[in-house]
């Protein structure tokens, strides 16, 4: 038996301990007490737990077997003993010793238990197919006596037969457990066998020597695992693993076991991964069976002879994931706390690689030695992935699921997204604020709101009254009054302090007021503090006695009501000299050259000589903030050297070049001055032909000499659309007044342009604003004429009669008909001409045009008309009435507010600068062209190329001329007397704005005169003449934007007449008007005429009218709603696009 090598225990195989590590003294001690220890392990598992093999447990930890739960190795050793003791009969002699040892150790078991725990039902290390049989054997083992223990060992023998590794023989009396390595591969061990060896993993220190004496076979002391690294509180020397390992050694005889047997036993273990549902380490995949190659590799490694260092190297490879076993199984569950490698799970067991400790999240830990409470949930298969194991089994503050080791069988799966292992449903149970509950609408009532009325209270109150039933419904609220009140409050100066108040006491009051306002209005800027030296000293009382500084009079410390507006930033001076200096500097700045260059408001208010009333200056906000004393302002200005005062002392102006600043055309309205009103009558009373053309000739000089003139017109343009519906001119006369003397019309114009308070009659917001002068009456016809041009869809004949047509003179024409210059083909030239025509029209409507027309020798007028002719009443109404200038008195009336003055200014600008009906329409609609140039084709068409059938593409193209128009201001005058040309009497003089047209020898004519001339040319020279074609072209373009019924009827009548005799230019121009005019403004009667004329034209074999109808139906937005004649529909279906009209039909080609 000596040649037999003893079989190592499974704990030694797993831990890889060298047998030479044990001391000789321990070997002798194990040999003496081996009988007692073996009996203790066989009879009952509680007894074995009372005396656990500490040394063996410590050796397991050193070898890295921290993953195996407690009790698994012991259960295997029992199976091994059963298999070995079947042929051996020496085991019976050891029974009495085992019985005695069992009786002695039982009382020690009770104090070892730290915490109560349920008995485990499943052995996580070995789950075999013979699970039921092994469970029954384990139950019998607990109840039977010593003979029953022997029978249990014998019945367990067939289980050992599965082991493929040979079992080394040893003395049975010394080593009862050499069979442990063989059952490692077995799977027949029941789960219940796990309960007993793991019930008490810790034993008292007193039992340590008893277990140590039992192990005789251990010749060396096993190195212990530093469990302080795992649990932090168990020392290697006192760990119960030593007891467990020493107790385990009693199953092995005291004989020596070679390392070769250790490796054979290790290789014989079944490493198949049959566990299902076990948590994985990092792989996350299901466990798979190991291949036969892995088993062969393990067997080859077990059969090799190696030293203890070689075995340690093998286990180090296993830890570092370098062994073949670990390489083939990457989905193993590993304990991160104890660095365990071996595990049993789901009926299989095997080695597992070591995984780096990643916070212990995915790696279950075996039960610690300090925790005696075990259950079947201690196996790694019951630990959820997202739960970190608690290394300290005694952590009582930990969750119940993780307390006592890895007891996670009752732990509920926590939500990953909720802290402390909570679940999603727990959030709803927790109280939340109202703004966090988004699942429903939260009524957020105002806590200060009164309680809601009950049904009885609502019934008692009854329904709400109607607005009509409420008495005193008209509150007569005046918005302008409110604004003026705020205006006066804003610019109102703070009150002076009482002169009898001591400066020191006044400063105290100001500090108190500042503190008071700061507490209620933290955003208010601090009130400027007044220094004592700025305040006037106390005045002398009656009798010449000065009041003492600290008199006994009570001081009123009440804080007055703080105004809405902030107080002025600068303190108000208390002396008149300082105040005059401030006022003088402020007014001098108004009249400085720097300010006048940009202050158009002052320049419009100036008279011809540059004067402005002092009352106007006194009403400015900055001046009013300094003082409202009119006499003080006059006194301050008398000492000024930078402003000049008028002889009467009521007006001031700039001292240097005062006449260059006024903007004369806009001087009128509420703040008009007596300068223009006093000089204007003298100009209008002049008679003679020289005075007639003076206003017209003086206008270009004014525009060229004054650099501010263009700026004035830009100001007027910015107010387009604001003067809609207002009367525009006082020079318009009715048919009854056409032949009245021109002096009467002059007087009306004079009264209309220079009346002081004319603006009050044209602004509803300031009705009754104080204008006392009589407003001149406007002629009725002018109102009707202009309103007809604005409000009606059609332009009246009275507007057409004011048209001024500009066409090239006949001298520019040649036989080829190409009269246009090179500049006319450029877009820049056309744009400049367009701008010049608009400016010319504005000036025609702005500057009054007075012309002396010879009247009849005999005429009768009334007395009123005679007085108006003389201009007596107008002179009184205008020049004799001085402007309302307040007198220098103490009771100065409050000037008009800024709102009123702005409204007056807008009204004055819109009235004094009238706009033509065309400009008013353009302010509401899009702009219309006033110049119609000739757009010649870029290159002549080839004779063989397809083209449209129109007169321009014929062999003899018609003569076309550009044409322009502007709207004049006066109606067409009657025929001029003998000796005066019609054009010179009705057309205004040439203007610089149309200098480009004058360079190209354009001639301007009144529309009626030009039309008659064209009709005469048509009658005398034939239907196809240049003048008539120009008239057709003008009608075609002008009627698209400005439709006039009479003009259209005449256009259509003459075009159809020319078409009957073969002249096509007029009918083609008519078709162009139909197509583009209906697109801009659809008129049903015009559309009917369009289809009728096109039908007639198509029946004659022409296609131009059909092409324009086709183009209109394609561009029109309402084409689908229009009804087309059946004949035209059939003809239109022959063409798909406008390009198809270039190709003539086959019938036409033949």
Curated annotation (Swiss-Prot):
Q: Which Gene3D superfamilies match?
A: Winged helix-like DNA-binding domain superfamily/Winged helix DNA-binding domain (1.10.10.10)
Q: Name one Pfam family in it.
A: La
Q: Where, per UniProt, does this protein localize?
A: Cytoplasm, P-body
**Matches recorded under SMART domains:** DM15, LA
Note the InterPro entries from the entry: DM15, La_dom_prot, La_HTH, WH-like_DNA-bd_sf, WH_DNA-bd_sf
Functional summary from the UniProt entry: RNA-binding protein that promotes oogenesis by repressing fem-3 expression during germline development. Binds poly-U and poly-G stretches of RNA in vitro. Regulates target RNAs expression either by regulating their stability or translation.
| This protein's name | La-related protein 1
Q: Which organism is it from?
A: Caenorhabditis elegans
As recorded in Swiss-Prot or TrEMBL, the protein's gene is named larp-1
